């Protein structure tokens, strides 16, 4: 049986108030120092929480558990009822929060080592080989540089299995993931993009233009955060 957390013994902080079809997001801190993120659709309308809410909670927990051993996703994911889930809080910064280095600005040194992006890209290829794509890695809020410098990928609600898809479709979806990561690599370390990675990025861009694949956003309000 999964361990439970007493509501009377936990410090609960609202991080995101949610919206029409978005979960409220909380930070939970237990007396023994464990920290979790909680996503809760309970505050949405009856229709939303019983359709989108149930579906997304079940979906995200499924992929987090499937990939937990890779070390690139938050651990201890579990459902807390039909509309709510918890996962371990990942201490660190998202790639969106880290400023792009500017050689013209004193003190604007690159804070992310090249090795981080190689680790991230290789881990993503392993995930693809296991038959899973993320599909929202253009959103740099979903890519974390953890406190120990390792990559962590968040928000698996858009993910899908690719085992049963036709090879051209599978490669198309994998290219969507690859482009998100390689664009971030090119943003922070353009000098480290070798010919192979540069070709992969250009290929992914061509595929995107050909099929007009728009970037995935939850809401306009979220995109501005």
Functional labels for PLM-detected ranges:
Residues 129-145:
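Catalytic-loop of the protein kinase fold
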Residues 146-225:
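C-lobe/activation-segment region of protein kinase-like
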């Amino acid at each position: 049986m999964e361990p439970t957390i007493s509501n009377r013994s936990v410090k609960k902080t609202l991080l995101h108030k949610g919206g029409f079809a978005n979960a409220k997001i909380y930070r939970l801190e237990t007396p023994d120092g464990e920290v979790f993120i909680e996503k809760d659709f309970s505050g949405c309308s009856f229709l939303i929480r019983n359709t989108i809410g149930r579906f997304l909670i079940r979906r995200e927990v499924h992929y987090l558990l499937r990939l937990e051993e890779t070390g690139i996703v938050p651990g201890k994911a579990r459902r807390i009822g039909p509309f709510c889930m918890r996962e371990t809080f990942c201490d660190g910064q998202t790639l969106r929060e880290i400023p792009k280095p500017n050689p013209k600005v004193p003190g604007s040194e690159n804070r992310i080592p090249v090795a981080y992006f190689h680790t991230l890209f290789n881990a993503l290829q392993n995930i693809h080989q296991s038959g899973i794509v993320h599909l929202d890695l253009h959103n740099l809020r979903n890519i974390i540089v953890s406190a120990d410098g390792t990559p962590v990928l968040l928000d698996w609600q858009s993910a899908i299995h690719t085992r049963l898809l036709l090879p051209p479709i599978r490669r198309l979806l994998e290219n969507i993931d690859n482009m998100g990561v390689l664009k971030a690599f090119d943003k922070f370390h353009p000098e480290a993009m070798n010919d192979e990675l540069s070709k992969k990025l250009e290929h992914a861009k061509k595929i995107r233009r050909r099929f007009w694949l728009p970037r995935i956003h939850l809401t306009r309000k979220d995109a501005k955060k």
